[in-house]
Amino acid sequence: MDANSFVFPNDPGIAWSIMIVLYPYITGLVAGAFVVSALYHVFHQEVLKPVAKLALVTSLCFCSCATLPLLLHLHHPERALNIMVTPNGTSAMAGFGFIYSLYMLLLVVEVWLVFRPTIVERANSRIGAAGLVYRILALGARKMTDGSRQVDDWAIRLLAMAGIPIACILHGYVGFLFGAIKANPWWSTALMPVIFLISAIVSGIAGLIVLYVGMCWRRGVKPDADCVRAMCRYLWVALVVAVSLEMLELGHMAYESGAEWKVLSTLLTEHLAVSYGLIQVVIGSLCPFLLLLIAVRPRLNPRLMTACGGLASLLVLVQVFAMRWNVVVGGQLFSKSYRGFVEYTVPWGGREGIIAAAIVLTLPLLALWLADKLLPLWQDSEPSASLPFETGSRIMSPEPIGAAFAITAETPPAERTQPVQAQLTSPAK
């Protein structure tokens, strides 16, 4: 039969929508935030101490919502647990269910151990409903000893060490699923798991910078300049590696010039020209690269460094989302017969629309806000010299005290004793 009698493309549409884009995006934030926490707990990067707790709780909050996009995508979400009850030994999705459960349990235990001193202290000091909540979280513990703290520190480090490969597998398997689809040339590459993993670290570090700077701004405190600069340095290195791997993959496809390159080049230059060329490459990769080069300069003004790092992190988060979109949705836009393209427009409503996606992205932030109300998300800082401090029953400001010391130091001894002598020699009334 003549091929001209067919209408191409003959594909009904795409199967994986924006929810499948959100799923690797959220799991990437989970893995990247945990890596930052592990840099402090395992590799003793003391410069990351201000964000160590925030990174761990952020990973837990986003991990608790990571499966929501998959449940919204399923037509029968009530059957989701079947993958755990009757697993298939050769299914990567079944393996993910067990890895996700193990990682979630590890996060819960590690967060509890990190905050256990605070939980026990508040269980003893708080009353009412708040005290009941902390006593439940304390699991019967009413005091902390030096020995128990040492055991907790050892367990935290052990869990952080075990969590690094689990977090990498948790997100790397998503790239493994796409790379294993041999029928799609846009997905079938051995670099796909590595690209997904490195981009996860990029998004996690960028997300932590945005959260830390935003929370400091909301509380009216200055971000730790050394901590922000260190995270910007890690982000710059991870961004260079991620973009280099993506460009190597694309360059290899172009140099090989297989039968599929014609449709892939049309896909990139026409259908993904904005999301790939403009957003992912120019806005999300080139601009953050230049901004981070400015932010990592050692003698840069802290406010300018924080502004450059925060703006670069926001652009990187957009870049990673665009990368997920271009991989998941872009790989479904061309016909399986390489003859024509499929159009896809994201609806506003429905369980796989823009509003539902915005709600899914908001839920982890809401969980993080609740966690901030319940537990201290970063290390206690030293009292600032500009803040008033308490002496006895009076609140005194450091400025009058400093002025008094200055006057005392500059006034000659004879003049300092003159008012006292005048008071003693004055006649009593």
List each model region and its residues.
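Loop-to-helix transition at the N-terminal end of transmembrane alpha-helices
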Residues: 14-25, 48-60
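Membrane-interface transmembrane-helix boundary segments in multi-pass integral membrane proteins
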Residues: 19-23, 94-97, 192-196, 258-283, ...
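Long, contiguous internal "core" modules enriched in hydrophobic/ aromatic residues
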Residues: 24-26, 46, 106-306, 311-312, ...
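N-terminal signal-anchor module of multipass membrane proteins
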Residues: 1-42, 369, 385-387, 394, ...
